[in-house]
Amino acid sequence: MKVGIIGSGGREHSICLSMKKSSKVDKIYCFPGNAGTSEIAENISIDLENHQNIKDFILDKKIDLVIIGPEKPLVEGLVDYLEKFKIKTFGPNKIASKLEGSKIFTKKLCQKYNIPTARFGIFKNKRDAKEYLNNSNFPIVIKADNLASGKGVYICENKKNGYIAIDEIFNGKFGEAKNILIEEFLNGEEMSFFTIHDGKIFKNFGTAQDHKRVLEGDRGKNTGGMGAYSPSRLINDELKKKIIEKIIKPTLQGLKDHGSEYKGFLYTGLMIVKNEPYLIEYNVRMGDPECQ
């Protein structure tokens, strides 16, 4: 069996290592890959935005399964494109990828399907967003709607920091911003909950605790992840059941109502408050560093 792995991070190196251990896998391609993957797979230099070139290479090499690591190709619809050519691909389609591609899409899904999450407001311009801050309690959380490589979330301790966050997002720090999300700060402890889906059923894939702040003592701006450990010490049978029944299953139903069945890894970012789970965000792929 030939496997193609798309991406260039530590996450993709970890997936390559796991594939290498399988007796069913004869050959691994990683595009574009990195120095680590070059030791266990054949790195292929392909522009990930050129879907046609990716498709041509996969068909030419008769690759049996493609695993997409990062979020950007998923949000851009690479799965949908490859599946048109009957290429077996592991990852969510474009509709399902909106769970990560648009934080506002996910918040509206939470609202409609009664998924526990922080209270929030959606704003289309700086003036309205800043006016909202003038009457808010701090700390407060401000988020860019679109993809931001894990850096589009601001935890603002005061109005000045909130104004800076609003200006940066609307001024295009993370690309064109038509909307901004402001939500209440939940005072709890974060936990990552992983599931793996085939479009029909899903299995729990473990938990982790990710540390995102760039400085020691949980200070500084968010990153994609400075480090992680697994399993999370917060998980227990009661909490696991609540996460599945209150968050995962209603989300899958919401996607089904949008005409999409989820396939791939689903990374559920949670805040745990007194053993109650609240959805912070979804990632439609494995985390990095959590996957490692």
Language model segments and positions:
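ATP-binding N-terminal substructure of ATP-dependent carboxylate-amine bond-forming enzymes
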Residues: 1-94
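General beta-strand structural signal in soluble alpha/beta enzymes
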Residues: 5, 30-31, 67-68, 89-92, ...
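Short acidic-hydrophobic, aromatic-tinged amphipathic segments that line or gate anion-handling sites
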Residues: 43-49, 121-125, 156
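Glycine-rich phosphate-binding loop signature in dinucleotide/nucleotide-binding domains
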Residues: 58-63, 135-136, 175-176
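A conserved helix-loop-beta module that forms one wall/lid of the active-site cleft
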Residues: 90-152
